[in-house]
């Protein structure tokens, strides 16, 4: 690459670096985006660079594929209802083992390998996430039926004090989505929804969903149908028309929730795209879908 071209790329990023200096970005790092070593390296480098140019990334991670593999090794079949994992006591122990015991530490190690300072947390750390058991409903024969998801929670309250301290001390917090109820019971939280709640509580400027798709598309197999910018009302219309289904629905609920709580924009990007986070933030066109309130 010619030297002047490199300079042009850096200069294109300058107004965004100025605009977002000292802002908080919540990065939801999906399990499906952790597909290979190269993709994990790209994400880690992007987050460390953000920190060094004065932006404060806060990571909430998932781990669905690894949890599924661990469950299958132990003879359990993963079960989902509307994109939420049905979680009995044994499944919860597997979830905690994979999220807190493995994935969280792996992400912290990657960030530190590339020059960042990172601290692994869960929602249990410093009473970070207070949760309650989630009640899920399904419609059957025009009747609303309550479904028991087991030890699945929803966020009641996020105490940001610990995250604030770490951010001020130049650390990148890395959070596993396990919450605690008022009786001290652990609850499995959907990582997308937890990320939206934490982003709102932190007054984050952006919520960036790093997943395994390029963004929101009319046809998942046709890159030309990718939407670069959508509003909440447009998103709701797409759900009604069946363009958004399954595991994407909790992601969209998290996006809308974050925007309702004051986050300025939400971005969905593909972690398999080299340096997708940097390209989405620091270029005019971006590489994914940006969602705004209106």
Swiss-Prot record:
It holds the Pfam family AA_kinase. Its main location: cytoplasm. Catalyzes the ATP-dependent phosphorylation of N-acetyl-L-glutamate. This is Acetylglutamate kinase. One of its GO terms (molecular function) is acetylglutamate kinase activity. Pathway: Amino-acid biosynthesis; L-arginine biosynthesis; N(2)-acetyl-L-ornithine from L-glutamate: step 2/4. It is found in: Cytoplasm. One of its GO terms (biological process) is arginine biosynthetic process via ornithine. Belongs to the acetylglutamate kinase family. ArgB subfamily. Disulfide bonds: none annotated. PANTHER family: N-ACETYLGLUTAMATE SYNTHASE, N-ACETYLGLUTAMATE SYNTHASE, MITOCHONDRIAL. It comes from the Archaea. GO terms for cellular component: cytoplasm. It comes from Methanococcus maripaludis (strain C6 / ATCC BAA-1332). The keyword Ribosomal protein does not apply. Substrate binds at residues 63-64, 85, 188. The gene is argB. The record marks 28, 251 as: Transition state stabilizer. Keywords: Amino-acid biosynthesis, Arginine biosynthesis, ATP-binding, Cytoplasm, Kinase, Nucleotide-binding, Transferase. Its EC number is 2.7.2.8. It catalyses: N-acetyl-L-glutamate + ATP = N-acetyl-L-glutamyl 5-phosphate + ADP.
């Amino acid at each position: 690459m010619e030297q002047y071209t490199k300079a042009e790329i850096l200069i294109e990023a300058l107004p965004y670096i100025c605009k977002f200096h000292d802002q908080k970005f919540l990065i939801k790092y999906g399990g499906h985006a952790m597909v290979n070593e190269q993709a994990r390296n790209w994400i880690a480098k992007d987050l460390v660079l953000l920190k060094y140019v004065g932006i404060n990334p806060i990571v909430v991670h998932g781990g669905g594929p690894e949890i599924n593999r661990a469950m299958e090794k132990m003879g359990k079949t993963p079960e989902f209802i509307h994109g939420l994992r049905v979680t009995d006591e044994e499944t919860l122990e597997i979830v905690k083992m994979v999220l807190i015991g493995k994935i969280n530490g792996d992400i912290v190690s990657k960030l530190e390998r590339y020059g960042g300072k990172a601290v692994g947390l869960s929602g249990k750390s410093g009473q970070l996430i207070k949760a309650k058991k989630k009640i899920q409903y399904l419609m059957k024969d025009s009747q609303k039926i309550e479904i028991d998801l087991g030890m699945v929670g929803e966020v009641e309250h996020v105490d940001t004090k610990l995250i604030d301290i770490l951010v001020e001390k130049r650390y990148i917090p890395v959070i596993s989505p396990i919450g605690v109820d008022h009786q001290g019971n652990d609850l499995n939280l959907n990582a997308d929804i937890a990320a939206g709640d934490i982003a709102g509580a932190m007054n984050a400027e952006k919520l960036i969903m790093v997943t395994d798709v390029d963004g929101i598309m009319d046809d998942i197999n046709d890159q030309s149908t990718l939407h670069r910018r959508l509003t909440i009302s447009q998103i709701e219309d797409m759900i009604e028309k069946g363009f958004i289904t399954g595991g994407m629905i909790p992601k969209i609920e998290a996006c809308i929730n974050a925007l309702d709580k004051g986050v300025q924009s939400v971005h969905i990007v593909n972690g398999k795209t080299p340096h997708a986070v940097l390209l989405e933030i620091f270029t005019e066109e971006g590489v994914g879908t940006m969602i705004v309130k209106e």
